[in-house]
Amino acid sequence: MTFSLFKEVIMMKKLALLATGFVCAGLLGACSSQGMATSNKDMGQQTAKAGDRQTSGKKVKDFNLQGVDGKTYRLSDYKGKKVYLKFCASWCSICLSTLEDTNELAKEEAGKDYVVLSVVAPTFNGEKSAADFKNWYQSLDYKDFPVLLDSKGELLKEYGIRSYPSALFINSDGTLSKSQIGFMNKEDILKTLENMQ
């Protein structure tokens, strides 16, 4: 192999490595959605308001949402139980990769002191329409936990949800125990639930 050919091969490998780095960086940011562009001042105000709403110990506002299954779900229906409320999106690779764990966690809830609920906001933050989401989700094999449709984006706004996955851990008395942004494995979710009131 000639020296110039060797240099060309090295250069091509460097370019491939650089391209791979850009793809990885894009994937890491894929599950972070900021919606429409806002000024830094507006974003700071939104973040501050979201932080105010997500204070541990604060009473969580009741909601009334329709599920993909057509049933109506209210937070108040679960009074006396701990609630793991997971916000996700169909385009979020992390959310999709954790569906099996979420489903298993929900299967295990029978006889336990907690319940698993998931929330999707159709047409918000790049999500499909409600009809398209229902068709897509019903083709999957995750039937052990309700998926609620926040069609007006009210919960997203109330809890300042801008990244997926995100979760709220709600105590059995209806107060917020913890909010979580990003991936959480099943074992950590269970530990959090066990340590709640």
Language-model-detected regions and their locations in the chain:
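Conserved redox-active cysteine motifs that mediate thiol-disulfide chemistry
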Residues: F87-E104
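A short beta-strand-turn-helix
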Residues: D62-V83
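Short, internal strand/loop/helix patches
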Residues: F133-I170
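Hydrophobic beta-strand anchors of alpha/beta hydrolase catalytic cores
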Residues: Y84-L85, V116, A167
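Thiol-/selenol-based redox modules, centered on thioredoxin-like
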Residues: F169-Q197
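N-terminal targeting signals for export/organelle localization
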Residues: M1-D62, Q197
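Thiol-based oxidoreductase modules, predominantly thioredoxin-like and allied folds used
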Residues: Y114-K128, D144-S151
